[in-house]
Amino acid sequence: MELALVGNPSNGVAKPSCNSVGSLPVVSSNAVINPPVTSAAGATLGRHLARRLVQIGATDVFAVPGDFNLTLLDYLIAEPGLKLIGCCNELNAGYAADGYARARGVGACAVTFTVGGLSVLNAIAGAYSENLPVICIVGGPNSNDYGTNRILHHTIGLPDFSQELRCFQTITCYQAVINNLDDAHEQIDTAIATALRESKPVYISVGCNLAGLSHPTFSREPVPLFISPRLSNKANLEYAVEAAADFLNKAVKPVMVGGPKIRVAKAKKAFAGIAESSGYPFAVMPSAKGLVPEHHPRFIGTYWGAVSTTFCAEIVESADAYLFAGPIFNDYSSVGYSLLLKREKAVIVQPDRVVVGNGPAFGCILMTEFLDALAKRLDRNTTAYDNYRRIFIPDREPPNGQPDEPLRVNILFKHIKEMLSGDTAVIAETGDSWFNCQKLRLPEGCGYEFQMQYGSIGWSVGATLGYAQAAKDKRVISCIGDGSFQMTAQDVSTMLRCGQKSIIFLINNGGYTIEVEIHDGPYNVIKNWDYTGLIDAIHNSDGNCWTKKVRTEEELIEAIATATGAKKDCLCFIEIIVHKDDTSKELLEWGSRVSAANSRPPNPQ
């Protein structure tokens, strides 16, 4: 059984039939570089790679030019249906490909050898940790220079050119170094297929003298890319379903919790289906927010140990059985390893494996097939949800601010909550925005993304650029702290070049707040910027941009009304001035527990 890419061969645009997220972007961006007048329409390596990107749905490539990749970029530009988006630096190009992959299912970036590759490395590591298929394309040295004793620029001064490759080997699932044409077709197709199958980044290095060359293996209209999907072992699937159904049907008050690997398994629909049929209350791990239907009446919130949604942890941890779909238990998601869970009560469902309690483990099982089959075998049980209903008390809204009273963070997020709809998506930066955005109840169709496993501050600027470019049917609302913004601010200019209309809330509290709550020190204080002034300078009267500095609730209400009204077609940048100690109670609790975990003394030797 094979999975073919589907689409319109006449225009070259196609994407995996299983990829239903996002929509293909319209070819209308000021950031797109016009194709040069060239005869590059033949069956060349560059054209083959460009066509493959279009076929899989990566119709935007985030790039930084360098002398080793310039010819390759010419072929990317020349490909109909493919846009080349120039970024301010390689790190943001990688972050943009990460955000794009979250909305579209796959992303791509293109940089130059070593100086570009090592700069994008951090972003690719983040994509690897978050299980995102990103095609990282590097323009490499001239193929004639491999195996010689020549020393090239953009290297560390050694004749061995493999340093960059070795760096990428641990953060990509496949590496292709193309320095001859004979196996270029095979290497490109294998790399792309592996990225889609494994849901991890891949590395493709193309010799700078090869992109414009033809070879018999390349065809003017490439043969469609076929990916053989993984299949469940039918016997194992039946045994696993029987064991899990017996385990859960014996429980008095079972619950379900969705984890981040639901995305990898493409099991959002299957999870929603079993949640509906089983009658169980269900929660979401913090890193999986946006992957389960929060508009469902039996959704009980975020399960995050001591900083869970009110009454959620009580129901989950008091259950006598719980089904976790795609969980990742790290020090952050477990709040310093403090979750009150028992392994013998859990059914752990990973993308290709099921473990039932302390008992049997079953491999070669797809999560989607397992959840669909299990849903038909579970007895309906609403006991845990009935218990939740008995103890539930709605959270109180924060009191309105007084006239001219300094704005509080909880007031800000009260108003952000009212902005959400199926036509919006939330990007939450590492920091206190993690905790405040977790409290937002997402309406049906509302997107949500953040980077919990890797937690690289500054990620959200590039991710906002990429997500907005991939999901043009949504308006992105980004919540970014001032410390994070200082890392990657310059690619707001790329958002303007692309004509994006995101709303960025820059929360200015004068420092690295999340680090303050883990371990305070003078290094957590940063130089304050005039952030709206910076964006005005970047805008420079070129593009649609509106900025506002806000200090009170009245000013916030007015700014949001303008951003969603008169300036709805603009990139809106709203700087929120708050007190340096204004943090969520969840961050205070989480920070103290993570600090305790970090400061554990060495085990006795």
Swiss-Prot record:
Q: Which GO terms describe its molecular function?
A: magnesium ion binding; pyruvate decarboxylase activity; thiamine pyrophosphate binding
Q: Would the keyword DNA-binding turn up in this protein's UniProt record?
A: no
Top-level EC class, please? lyase
**Ligand binding (Mg(2+)):** 482, 509, 511
What InterPro entries does the entry give?
A: DHS-like_NAD/FAD-binding_dom (IPR029035), PDC/IPDC-like (IPR012110), THDP-binding (IPR029061), Thiamin_PyroP_enz_cen_dom (IPR012000), Thiamin_PyroP_enz_TPP-bd_dom (IPR012001), TPP_enzyme_TPP-bd (IPR011766), TPP_PDC_IPDC (IPR047214), TPP_PYR_PDC_IPDC-like (IPR047213)
Instruction: Give the cofactor note.
Output: Binds 1 metal ion per subunit.
Question: Which residues of this UniProt protein bind substrate?
Answer: 67, 154, 515
What is this enzyme's EC? 4.1.1.1
| Superkingdom | Eukaryota
Q: Which Pfam families match?
A: TPP_enzyme_C (PF02775), TPP_enzyme_M (PF00205), TPP_enzyme_N (PF02776)
Give the catalysed reaction(s), semicolon-separated: a 2-oxocarboxylate + H(+) = an aldehyde + CO2
GO BP terms: namely: aromatic amino acid family catabolic process to alcohol via Ehrlich pathway
One GO cellular component, as annotated: cytosol
Could you list this entry's UniProt keywords, alphabetically sorted.
Decarboxylase, Lyase, Magnesium, Metal-binding, Thiamine pyrophosphate
Cofactor(s) listed in the protein's UniProt record: a metal cation; thiamine diphosphate
| Region named Thiamine pyrophosphate binding | 432-514
Q: How does it assemble?
A: Homotetramer.
Q: Which family does it belong to?
A: Belongs to the TPP enzyme family.
Recorded hits in PANTHER family, A to Z, give: PYRUVATE DECARBOXYLASE (PTHR43452), PYRUVATE DECARBOXYLASE 1 (PTHR43452:SF7)
Put simply, this protein is called Pyruvate decarboxylase 1
State the species of origin: Oryza sativa subsp. japonica (Rice)
Q: Which gene encodes it?
A: PDC1
